[in-house]
């Protein structure tokens, strides 16, 4: 599903980037998976409107779906393609690869959000590893 070869080649870059570890990569999803997810993007009725004041990390208003995915990897309002993607992000394969690339002690995906940034928002697709590390 993901281009792990590309990810693995960026491990050193991730670990050494300043002022914090990060990487930016294009085309990380296999094209057929991307096309299916793109074509099955949730429609307006699936989103709740988030006002700028509600989410400090959004530049502008955005719409989002989010769920606690620790115990349930299924969003009834999403397509099979999106549910398969969420399940993959919760899989041992994904977590193990992400742990190997980042060097972080990642244990599980605890939350999943689909954010549809509206005009003026600047958030791009990303993984917040802090949300995936086990609480101490």
Segments predicted by a language model, with ranges:
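Non-heme Fe(II)/2-oxoglutarate
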Residues: 2-5, 11-97
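Catalytic core of non-heme Fe(II) oxygenases with the double-stranded beta-helix
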Residues: 76-136
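Conserved double-stranded beta-helix
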Residues: 1-12, 107, 130-135
């Amino acid at each position: 599903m993901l281009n792990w070869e590309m990810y693995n080649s960026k491990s050193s870059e991730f670990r050494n980037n300043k002022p914090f570890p990060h990487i930016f990569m294009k085309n990380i999803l296999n094209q057929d998976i991307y096309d299916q997810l793109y074509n099955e993007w949730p429609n307006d009725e699936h989103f709740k409107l988030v006002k700028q004041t509600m989410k400090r990390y959004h530049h502008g208003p955005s719409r989002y779906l989010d769920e606690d995915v620790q115990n349930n990897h299924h969003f009834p309002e999403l397509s099979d393609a999106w549910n398969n993607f969420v399940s993959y992000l919760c899989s041992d394969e994904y977590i193990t690869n992400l742990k190997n690339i980042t060097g972080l002690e990642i244990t599980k995906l605890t939350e999943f959000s689909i954010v549809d940034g509206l005009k003026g928002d600047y958030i791009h697709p990303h993984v917040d590893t802090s949300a995936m590390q086990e609480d101490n």
